[in-house]
């Protein structure tokens, strides 16, 4: 594997704090660290988007339907719209895991499309799939329907599910499925450059 320098690596990292007990002081500190490290984005819960936006020059990402994915589609769309209004330029949406489990692919695709329509084309939309739960066939189908719905990226994990985070096999499968024009984001369980 080719070595990547620290500055290049930083640009693909979302400096993230999504714990429910995070405080405003924690968010301000996260933003200061993000500025110092020159990361690609600061990712916070929807209630902290405005504060983060006012405390860093780094792009802001926020989550919707987090962490379970079981929110109503209209709720996810409204949550995403509010986050964008508050300053987010990236949305990380958790797919409805029950629909993936039961193969309700049109529902998966329609929900992604609803969030895409709500936020517009200029906002980056990442769809989190919790790949540790699924067979290869389910991962492939979830990727295809997320992209058909308007996702800019597919993402491995919330990092909150008991199945763990990213796996190299899942990332490879996702990349092969979506091709070079759609992003693949490995998340969850990645703590070191070796990971």
How would you label these PLM feature ranges?
Residues 2-37, 41-42, 47-184, 191-195:
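Alpha/beta enzyme core
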